[in-house]
Amino acid sequence: MSSDNKYYKILLMENPFFNKRYDTPHEVPPFDKIKFEHYEPAMMEGMRLESEAIEALCNNPEEPTFENTIMPKTGEMLENVTSVFFNLLSACNSPEMEELSQKMAPLLSEHSNRITMNERLFLRIKYVWEKRHELDTEQQILMEKIYDGFLRTGANLPKEKKEELSELRTKLSQLSLQFSQNELHDTNAWTMHLTAEEDLAGLPESAVAAARQEAETRGMEGWVITLQAPSYGPFMQYSQRRDLREKVYRAMNSICTHDNENNNFENVRQLVNLRQQLAQIMGHKTYADFVLERRMAKDVEHVTDLMDKLLEAYLPVAEKEVAEIEQLAREKEGEDFMLQPWDFSHYGYLLKMQRYNIDSEMLRPYLQLEKVQDGVFGLATRLYGISFERATDIPVYHPDVVAYRVKDANGSFLAVLFADFHPRANKQSGAWMTTYREQWVEDKTGENVRPIVSIVMNFTKPTKERPALLTLGEVETFLHEFGHALHAIFSQVRYEALSCTNVYWDFVELPSQFMENYATEAEFLNTFARHYQTGDPMPQELIQRIRESRNFQCGYACCRQVSFCLLDMAYYTLSTPLAQDIRTFENQAWEKAMVLKTLDDSCMSVRFGHIMSGGYSAGYYSYKWAEVLDADAFSVFQQEGIFNTDTAARFRKEILSRGCSEHPMTLYKNFRGEEPGIDALLRRNGIGK
């Protein structure tokens, strides 16, 4: 045996990714055995094996069929290693992983391009597609998705155009990664070190304790404020130090604008222009045209129409809300007081207190993370009959992470769920749901392969003095990501490409935003909201004030979201290269939805990961689209009972379990009986009749 073969065998034995199946409960990735040095060899070998499998498939002398062309899983090893690597790149990062991601991104992109540009493979797929009438409904949908996917990656293009497209996609992959890492680094690079008690004026104890703990973690005295949401949000809302609010606000709004290696201005320009080039190679005038062709919204006109309707309804409300805050600020500070962006959150909080005598700190003692988790899991149990069992035998990727077995009402296994709740220095900000494995049915054995799901948050950590206590907004975030998780957990389709959240991009937020509706329902809060010290339930009059105040600043919030949609659409409806100054372009794009002035030197685009690197390019509207859907869907529960198990069973059957096995509008109408309208959203916000 040659030394090379010996090395390969040793590598195969030691590297968990080289095993076809993991020797772990439910074949969860063996996080406790995975080492950094395993990733690159496994990715390289995974690409080699997939290329071999594709070549064998193309060389098959038999007539192309669904079974011999569409069904074979050719990239299992590569999928296994990349799902772990890129998920941990967001949740449990390291400098070595970042460096490797930069190295592997172009190689993986080129590998993907070779597959989608493979003419022999495409001809086999096309042959099966032309006989799709012989397939059943779910097979036809899968066939359409695969065939369309090849078309949209350029399989039908002339050779020189394929090469150009391949280069574009590789550049986009590299730039997207660079954009994200620049934002992460620049966000983490800024801190404000406070050493005097007077600097803390107005801050609640929870914010003071978190700032103290942040300082201790860094080996510093005093308190440290960061640009992470659990630190930034409370400081801007509660701090009475206007000078410090301004400092923090300016820092947040200048992320990635500085003259350093994290500057993202040129990355924005290149990402927008490369996507425009890609769309035009594919025969579309703009990138938005290209994207929306395969969305529920269908085209730019439908998106624009929705935004116009929302602005018509909400802009007058938003302008009134801002005027009320300005009036309050002048009453407190004098007639000459000029409201600035760093004042809005603070005086908005004071107005809310004056009007409803409620703020997030009043609620926080009743929203202990463990109790909230019991409530959220309990909601799923009450609606769907499922249960969650903590599983200490399942490996996790960080000590903060907890694993659960999710079981159906009949006791059958549904999924593994990881819960990762707290910030870390090596973890991206924000909140998200992801999968390490999706659901499908093994064709040969009939085995129903169940998903491995993870919900990732950045909730304030517990301190020495008190447990982790959430704001109501964080409870909504929990429900949101848990809704995504249920979409994956309940998946019951035959093919992986149609399962879990592999649905139209403007449908994917329905299950998540639907769950947020429960956050202000008294019947839900009564199940878990207890004071962390006394055990007393949240008072009913406090719950009533929550419900009365839930539409506070809803006009401003809607217009702000619409402004982001307008910015997204402005970039991706360009038909010529973006040459304008980014700040100027941004201000012009969202001007008609802007009810609060922005700073001349601020810029959102350079840190707007959603539309630059996060998959929402020409798709940010989907959040508002999903709001229309979720309000309409929840109105059914309001009519029939918010815990009605028959309604929940119908929602699970027609929406949550079906993935992309039918067109989303068909699925929605199967549940609702009709297409959604905007009226339920307006009623929810106190604007409709």
Tell me what each language-model feature is:
Residues R48, E52, A56-E63, N80-S94, ...:
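Intrinsically disordered or highly flexible coil/loop and linker segments, enriched in small
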Residues E138, L142-E144, K171-Q174, Q181, ...:
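Active-site-proximal, well-structured secondary-structure segments within enzyme catalytic domains
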Residues T460-L479:
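Short pre-active-site segment immediately N-terminal to the catalytic Zn-binding motif
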Residues E79-N87, E144, D148, F344-K352, ...:
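Short, hydrophobic/amphipathic alpha-helical patches that form generic packing surfaces
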